[in-house]
Amino acid sequence: MISVLGAGVAGLCAATALSDAGLAVEVIEPQGAPPPVSRLAGGMLAPFCEGESAPEIIVTRGQAALAWWEAHVPGVERHGTLVLAAPRDAGDLDRFARATQNHRWVEPGALEPDLAGRFARGLFFGDEAHMDPGAALGALRETLQVRGVAFREGRPVGRIVDCRGIAAAPELADLRAVRGEMLEVVTPEVRLTRPVRLLHPRFPCYIVPRGQGRYMIGATMVESARPGPITARAVMELLSAAYTVHPAFAEAEVIATGTGLRPSYPDNIPAIRRDGDRIHVNGMYRHGFLMAPVLATELAQMMTRELAHAH
């Protein structure tokens, strides 16, 4: 038996990959734990866009995530990503193009008619995708439960795979928190079919369609371990950026706000680590939905080999 601690994206992907490999697994949800920060994610599968600031390993290995998610959950939308900048920030768009790959220049209105005439040009990353994080995590959980995987509180009975995110910081000395803040809005006045990233020198943002006029707007990146509600500054910056994309966002209803602490190692690269008999899958930073399946697959291969040698 393998006991996976935590039911966020890292834990559910790990449990799924271990179960796929035919290994006995259970998921331990710590009593009184807050909801996984994964549910606040953008749910963008955007390895090429991440190349603007992320190490090459995120770009190359993250490409495998799209096929993994499509094989395991419904609702993966392969419509690509559109990257824009206000006219005064046109240099940022050129810089983004130089720092990334697998894109082409487009007239934004040709892809998103609601943006016609608002931006002269944009970058289109056609091989990227997005999904609703809450729905995806719910689908993984449901599949595991159908397979007979137990979700429970209490003491683990098997080999421990620790996927508790920032809650594991006492055992991982170099794990730090990066605070993220997001909004969810609804408006019938804007129709977007794919994630739109707006570049900005101080507060870049992304807008992810959730269907039925709902949009997730995120996400701030603050080097802080402070919990608590969203700040007024974050709300103003995110809504200001959304307004730049389309003025109708000014009339949108804010239906939810969220904050979370992203678990991050110094190099911001998610990793599998060993501490005695305990295996940690952590450090997801802003790459949870992109890298959790990759590490989960690696974990399942590693544990399959080890258990085979143990017999």
Question: Where in this protein do the model-derived segments appear?
Answer:
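N-terminal Rossmann-like FAD-binding beta1-loop-alpha1 element of flavoenzymes
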Residues: 2-26
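Short hydrophobic core segments
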Residues: 5, 156-166, 296
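Active-site substrate-recognition segment that forms the wall
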Residues: 16-17, 21, 39, 75-76, ...
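Glycine-rich FAD pyrophosphate-binding loop
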Residues: 20-38
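Dinucleotide-binding Rossmann-like beta1-alpha1 core, especially the glycine-rich loop
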Residues: 43-113
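Short beta-strand to alpha-helix junction loop
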Residues: 53-64, 123-139, 229-234, 291
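Helical element adjacent to the flavin cofactor pocket in flavoenzyme catalytic cores
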Residues: 123-155, 159, 163
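C-terminal catalytic lobe of FAD-dependent flavoproteins
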Residues: 253-311
